[in-house]
């Protein structure tokens, strides 16, 4: 890519050359295939549109000082992707297939990997959706996994700098024993109102507390929380937050 101000690149979707897809039907996965189609065709009664039968992941590819492109722990994202599928009664994509698809899509779009030292990266967004046509509330039997990429800058406009967040006990991100420990869209939809309110008050995001005692820090709508005390890395002890990678 030419004439791109990588240092000013926003965290947003930018068109690339390819995405990679794989379908699950009749109890088995097909083969990953590259495509240039940016659109997914689904039936209007597909469960991903009605019952939240969908999941996603987020990881990055980095260009090193040596010019090589590297993915950061894609196998761990693959394991988390499978854990979400189990929770939502979706077909589990094998971790090795997940990693293979990530490598395929990065290689096919290597010209979009930002240069080393710019602060920009190539973001990968794997997603799985329940397909097919039915109305009842029950697990789907057909699925599709797609992995697309986009060059991005920092998620928060402040960049790699401290941000201000507000702790607002009036909102719950996820219910205890619910889906808080997996990466499904419903968790993020539930965080939007709190996030918008935080933005209106001048904060970068909202920090959620636990839904039981309403006083213990859990995580932000878009990021985990951790602290350092006596040179020890500390994260909240909760079963309703997403395991970090």
Regions found by a protein language model. Give the residues of each.
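Helix-start/capping segments and mature chain N-termini
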Residues: 1-101, 105, 135-245
């Amino acid at each position: 890519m030419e004439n791109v101000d990588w240092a000013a690149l926003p965290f947003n979707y930018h068109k690339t050359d390819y995405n990679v897809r794989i379908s699950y039907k009749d109890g088995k996965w097909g083969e990953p295939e590259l495509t240039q189609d940016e659109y997914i065709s689904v039936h209007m009664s597909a469960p991903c549109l009605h019952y939240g039968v969908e999941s996603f992941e987020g990881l990055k590819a980095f260009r090193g000082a040596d010019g090589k492109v590297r993915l950061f722990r894609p196998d761990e994202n693959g394991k988390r992707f499978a854990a979400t599928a189990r929770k939502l009664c979706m077909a589990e994509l094998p971790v090795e297939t997940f990693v293979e698809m990530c490598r395929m899509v990065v290689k096919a779009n290597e010209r979009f990997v930002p240069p080393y030292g710019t602060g920009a990266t190539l973001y990968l967004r794997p997603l799985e959706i329940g397909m097919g046509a039915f109305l009842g509330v029950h697990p789907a039997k057909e699925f599709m996994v797609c992995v697309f990429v986009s060059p991005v800058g920092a998620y928060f406009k402040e960049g790699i700098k401290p941000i201000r967040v507000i702790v607002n006990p009036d909102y719950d991100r996820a219910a205890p024993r619910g889906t808080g420990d997996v990466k499904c869209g419903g968790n993020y939809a539930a965080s939007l109102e709190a996030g918008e309110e935080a933005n209106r008050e001048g904060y970068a995001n909202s920090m959620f507390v636990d839904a039981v005692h309403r006083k213990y820090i859990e995580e932000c709508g878009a990021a985990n929380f951790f602290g350092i005390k006596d040179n020890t890395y500390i994260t909240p002890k909760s079963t309703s937050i997403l395991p970090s990678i």
